[in-house]
């Protein structure tokens, strides 16, 4: 009795609860999942510094059952990693799962979906980004010509201002017409 391991202080849990869409219990569950990815690397009890500095390699995160079959798993890791390489600290991992939770609002989900599809990270989804998305989704099932036609059609239909690329507002307009966007942009912990 009395030998309970405390993962986070009360203040840390309050802070995490304030900046995510999770309850305290869910935050502790997220930490457990994070630790299971690399128990040799992630301490059972984390200090504030470790929560942002101990990073689990992207390759380990990509193997999670919830991401394993997702063709965008690497881009998801890169979009949430502070190092840009896809390696996630606990805080990065918590942010990612918070955005993919049912409680996250639509505008935050749209922002991160845009970030995932913006392969060149220029703040727009251009032709090259669409080609990368199509290649990621279809592998070699479509020809380069078919990829080209689809990318051209998306730009033609979604590019309201005619600049040849999609801004986040144009992307949001398109993505919100997809009836299953909110339900598919989701990871259950």
UniProtKB/Swiss-Prot annotation:
SUPFAM superfamilies: EF-hand. One of its GO terms (molecular function) is magnesium ion binding. Ca(2+) 2 binds at residues 159, 161, 163, 165, 170. Residues 68-103, 105-140, 146-181 form the EF-hand domain. Disulfide bonds: none annotated. Its main location: cytoplasm. Disruption phenotype: RNAi-mediated knockdown results in reduced photoresponse and impaired responses to flicker stimuli at high frequencies. Failure to sustain an adequate photoresponse during prolonged stimulation. No obvious eye dysmorphology when raised under 12 hr:12 hr light-dark conditions. Significant photoreceptor degeneration when raised under constant light for 5 days. Keywords: Calcium, Cytoplasm, Magnesium, Metal-binding, Repeat. Ca(2+) 1 binds at residues 118, 120, 122, 129. The keyword Nucleus does not apply. It comes from the Eukaryota. GO terms for cellular component: cytoplasm. InterPro entries: CIBP, EF-hand-dom_pair, EF_Hand_1_Ca_BS, EF_hand_dom. It is found in: Cytoplasm. GO terms for biological process: calcium ion homeostasis; phototransduction. Calcium- and integrin-binding protein. Plays a role in intracellular calcium homeostasis. Critical for proper photoreceptor cell maintenance and function. Required for prevention of light-dependent retinal degeneration. The binding of either calcium or magnesium significantly increases the structural stability of the protein in comparison to apo-CIB (calcium- and magnesium-free form). Monomer. Homodimer. This is Calcium and integrin-binding family member 2. It comes from Drosophila melanogaster.
